[in-house]
Amino acid sequence: MKSGRFIGVMSGTSLDGVDVVLATIDEHRVAQLASLSWPIPVSLKQAVLDICQGQQLTLSQFGQLDTQLGRLFADAVNALLKEQNLQARDIVAIGCHGQTVWHEPTGVAPHTLQIGDNNQIVARTGITVVGDFRRRDIALGGQGAPLVPAFHHALLAHSTERRMVLNIGGIANLSLLIPGQPVGGYDTGPGNMLMDAWIWRQAGKPYDKDAEWARAGKVILPLLQNMLSDPYFSQPAPKSTGREYFNYGWLERHLRHFPGVDPRDVQATLAELTAVTISEQVLLSGGCERLMVCGGGSRNPLLMARLAALLPGTEVTTTDAVGISGDDMEALAFAWLAWRTLAGLPGNLPSVTGASQETVLGAIFPANP
């Protein structure tokens, strides 16, 4: 069974940077050693946003974007290696999620697409890469997401305490770690995505730092109710979603009914939408004693306060409180999934994704010996 140093690479739906994590992994433990966040050039970020909103690209443009993202991921890995004074031979493998540009796990031909050429990463780092984690699960009838609940269960499950882990990235997803029950998990809906999109369009800021804009506004209740009527929120699990659904176009369609509203009030309403949709799903899933939050949204004081208010009797905390950096959780999970793939172990949970069976995930891109 392969063990040693692994690197996880994650570029999520929030597009706030490439997260790279170094960890030692074996069958008994996962120990994070180092991490860094690598910036995404504005031009690349905009290209990804455009394709996620349905903008058509030529095959040449698509191929260029795939190559550019692969090179970006390789640069991020090499920066971490340099910072830690490590060589390619010191790393067993890289687990790279890739950049999701489309996720459509239902319909006539279910599919998901993550780009960022793994061949570029191997060529530029000299390290074996495990990637393309989601499509095997979809081929077996699953949603292909979320995949992180298996990792949450391995690290954070408790024998008697009802726990849930909430990742608030661009999309929010919930892992249900309930003693005596199969692990559950699904995407609750938008996390930071709509809040970030709104403040970017209105103020040119990548995100609402310390929820300053949202705190200065007031929730527009009719707008909130209008958004909550979206059928995704009442859809039963298993379910997953992404930027191809909850994007700026989705927000604009709801705002057409509310002309002339204060931008800060919209920001406050979007924060409330995220908090309400999460808390409703926690309660519908039977509630928990402890909700551990990770991802960028765990740094949003308004979101954390609203979750605590909407979930009385639940201890709302961050995964940092139990020794796991909330900023690095997903990248760490894909390092762990790479380890499982190389060990020939399944990485999905049918109770979460709806797949017909457990399966080894991903494709292996071996480095030269």
Curated annotation (Swiss-Prot):
ATP binds at residues 12-19. One of its GO terms (molecular function) is ATP binding. Gene3D superfamilies: 3.30.420.40. InterPro entries: Anhydro_N_Ac-Mur_kinase, ATPase_NBD. Transmembrane segments: none annotated. It catalyses: 1,6-anhydro-N-acetyl-beta-muramate + ATP + H2O = N-acetyl-D-muramate 6-phosphate + ADP + H(+). It comes from the Bacteria. The keyword Transcription does not apply. Its EC number is 2.7.1.170. Keywords: ATP-binding, Carbohydrate metabolism, Kinase, Nucleotide-binding, Transferase. Pfam families: AnmK. One of its GO terms (biological process) is 1,6-anhydro-N-acetyl-beta-muramic acid catabolic process. The keyword ATP-binding applies. Pathway: Amino-sugar metabolism; 1,6-anhydro-N-acetylmuramate degradation; Cell wall biogenesis; peptidoglycan recycling. Belongs to the anhydro-N-acetylmuramic acid kinase family. HAMAP family: AnhMurNAc_kinase (MF_01270). Catalyzes the specific phosphorylation of 1,6-anhydro-N-acetylmuramic acid (anhMurNAc) with the simultaneous cleavage of the 1,6-anhydro ring, generating MurNAc-6-P. Is required for the utilization of anhMurNAc either imported from the medium or derived from its own cell wall murein, and thus plays a role in cell wall recycling. This is Anhydro-N-acetylmuramic acid kinase. It comes from Escherichia coli (strain SE11).
